[in-house]
Amino acid sequence: VKRYCTQKVANQTPQRIIHLGYESTGSFQMPGVPLSSMLPAMKDFTVNRVSAIRAQVNIPVVSTNKIIWQLGANYWGSNFNLENPGTNLFAKELNNNSMTSAGINTTIFKPLNEKNFLILQASVDANGFFKSMSDINGKSLTLSATAIYGWKTSEKNMIGTGIARTYRAGQLIHVPVLFWNKTFNDRWGMELLLPAKGHLRYNFSTSNMLQAGFELEGNQFSMRLPNSQNGTVFIQRGEFKPRIMWDKKISGFIWFNVQAGLRYNYRFDVMNQYDAKKDNQRYFTSKLGNPMFFNFSLNFVSP
């Protein structure tokens, strides 16, 4: 009988099937926002906070020892609260509408034998400031994908490498990835998917875990802006988040997660074209301040 490796290591954090969370930052500065594309004058703004609702669902479609296939959907809506947006069109749009990312994704874990496996992941997201569904078009969409080939050397160690197409840094990049989940002993372990995220894990028990690490997240968001060069700009938003996380089981398959850390501005480039990278395609760049953030979520996890 042919045997196949599983997708987990011992004492790993549980996989979330349903996730609902709230996140909030402290206040920070948003400098260098232009009055319009025709006027060189800049203005600095104070952002009192950014509050966000986050939700995710991952449903196992096929789950056998030969293959695990999941379909999912995600939502990330950020609301910027500016102290005094005034008549600046960019600041008003940012203050009055939610910066939204909503999409669908699929993940396949395919064990090849007892030692080797493949992980394939793809997602498409609609990102922008949408007042209605008609605001969503092809230039609001981003496509991300990851392919990993790996080795499971024991029930405590999985390692793999591959390549990713991602907008996590706000701008489209293709980057090699390192996947490594390892449990050192009953207390300590690590869960890495570099360069996207990485955490050192401490298990008080199998239902009570503390993690320290980071995550890089973001996307490219479209915004209609009448006074810009083309009437629409694209905000390339990337955030680097060093953080501490606490996961604990409440009852059955219901867990809570609390995290706190620093929201470091990796990128906040406002471009005149979709997937733009050149300086002459840039409307402006703002070197956002770096506030602390707090996140709380409830999660329904897999057995």
Residues covered by each model-derived region:
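Outer-membrane beta-barrel translocator/channel fold
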Residues: 34, 88, 195-294
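Residues that define the transmembrane beta-barrel architecture of outer-membrane proteins
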Residues: 47-53, 96-102, 137-143, 172-176, ...
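Residue-level signature of outer-membrane beta-barrel architecture
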Residues: 57-61, 108-110, 151, 182, ...
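Transmembrane beta-barrel domains of bacterial outer-membrane proteins
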Residues: 1-117, 121-134, 142-144, 295
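Outer-envelope beta-barrel architecture signal
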Residues: 12-18, 65-71, 114-120, 155-159, ...
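Transmembrane beta-strands of outer-membrane beta-barrel pores
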Residues: 22-28, 73-81, 124-130, 163-169, ...
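Outer-membrane beta-barrel "beta-signal"
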Residues: 178-182, 246, 287-303
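Extracellular loop and loop/strand-boundary signature of outer-membrane beta-barrel proteins
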Residues: 38-44, 88-94, 130-135, 164-166, ...
